[in-house]
Amino acid sequence: MSAAAAPAAEGEDTPTPPASEKEPEMPGPREESEEEEEEDDDDEDEEEEKEKSLIVEGKREKRKVERLTMQVSSLQREPFTIAQGKGQKLCEIERIHFFLSKKKTDELRNLHKLLYNRPGTVSSLKKNVGQFSGFPFEKGSTQYKKKEEMLKKYRNAMLKSICEVLDLERSGVNSELVKRILNFLMHPKPSGKPLPKSKKSSSKGSKKERNSSGTTRKSKQTKCPEILSDESSSDEDEKKNKDESSEDEEKESEEEQPPKKTSKKEKAKQKATTKSKKSVKSANVKKADSSTTKKNQNSSKKESGSEDSSDDEPLIKKLKKPPTDEELKETVKKLLADANLEEVTMKQICKEVYENYPAYDLTERKDFIKTTVKELIS
């Protein structure tokens, strides 16, 4: 008892620590789980409140569409009026009126816009352009500068087409064309050139010329056959006379020559008659062909000339044949009789035989001539 009492007494004597100095009590596992559950409950309550705030009870009100209404002030167009200029109206200038009539309305829209600041309608476009007589403003004014800027935006082809309508020169750079157009439109006046000739009239004139030339050619062609017919008739008469003379010569030659050659001459006669008939037929054909063209006429003249030259030759020359063996023997005999056999060579005798018959080539019969010479000498 004494030992247990001693520590108690000692404990009573030791001072107790203050409350602030006491160590914090650590929560137990049960307390931690309870705190977590409370926090989870709080989170769930907050989520439920959010969901309730999102859910709208009843039908949703539709929003009205606010449409923008453009309150455009209606532009009041100025009434179209053609101001009187200082120059002459374009329709009164003959050449410009001619070019305006040739152009289409679409090609004149840019010119109309330049003159009146509006494209214009199809029905009144050409009329309005023709009524233009010059700009009412002066050179160097703001309106003049606006027109100059408008023209500078146009392409070269468009500026040239405007120059063509206004009867102006189309050569030069764009700046030159712009100045030329504006200077003219300030005070329009005629260029003094004559009206261009229409293509239709020129084509008609060319047709008339062709027709007139055609008639003259036809008349020449009709005259030529008459002349040719006269020439052909004279040719026929000459041919007949020649045929008759050739027949007379043949008869005389028949009387002179022996009767052996009569059959050959008769055959030649038949050939000659057939040739004369053919020549007469060809002359008639030439008459018909000569009336077709001049080229055929020239060719027919040449042919007739060649035929005439061939007809002039006697028929005996045509019918001559190379000498026979007997004739060659006789000629060789004559040559040997007159020649000195000691000096004369075979070559010289052959040459003399050839000279007696110059119209024929006797080189192939050289061997026959040599054999005859040898026979006669022996």
Swiss-Prot record:
Q: Which residues carry this modification: Phosphoserine?
A: 20, 33, 53, 74, 123-124, 161, 203, 206, 212, 229, 232-234, 245-246, 253, 290-291, 299, 304, 306, 309-310
Q: What is its main location?
A: nucleus
Q: Which domain of life is it from?
A: Eukaryota
What is one Gene Ontology biological process annotated in the Swiss-Prot or TrEMBL record? regulation of double-strand break repair
ADP-ribosylserine PTM positions read S282
Compositionally skewed regions (Basic and acidic residues) per UniProt: 20-31, 50-65
The biased composition feature labelled Low complexity covers 281-299
Subcellular compartments? Nucleus
Domain DEK-C: from-to ranges: 322-378
Q: Show where the record puts the motif Nuclear localization signal.
A: 207-223
Q: Bias regions of kind Acidic residues — which residues? A: 32-49, 245-256
Q: Which residue ranges does the record annotate as region Disordered?
A: 1-65, 186-329
For whether the record's keyword set contains Zinc, the answer is no
| InterPro entries, per database record | DEK, DEK_C, SAP_dom
List the GO terms this entry assigns under cellular component, sorted alphabetically.
B-WICH complex; contractile muscle fiber; nucleus
Which residues carry the post-translational modification Phosphothreonine, per the record? T14, T16, T292, T293
Which is an annotated GO molecular function term of this record? DNA binding
> Domain SAP: where?
149-183
The record places the DNA-binding region at 340-354, 370-374
Query: Which intervals carry biased composition (Basic residues)?
Result: 196-205, 261-280
Tell me what PTMs the record reports for this protein: Phosphorylated by CK2. Phosphorylation fluctuates during the cell cycle with a moderate peak during G(1) phase, and weakens the binding of DEK to DNA.
Show the PANTHER family listed in the entry: DEK PROTEIN (PTHR13468), PROTEIN DEK (PTHR13468:SF1)
| Its job | Involved in chromatin organization.
Could you describe the subunit structure of this protein?
Found in a mRNA splicing-dependent exon junction complex (EJC) with DEK, RBM8A, RNPS1, SRRM1 and ALYREF/THOC4. Interacts with histones H2A, H2B, H3, H4, acetylated histone H4, non-phosphorylated DAXX and HDAC2. Component of the B-WICH complex, at least composed of SMARCA5/SNF2H, BAZ1B/WSTF, SF3B1, DEK, MYO1C, ERCC6, MYBBP1A and DDX21. Binds DNA.
Write the protein's name.
Protein DEK
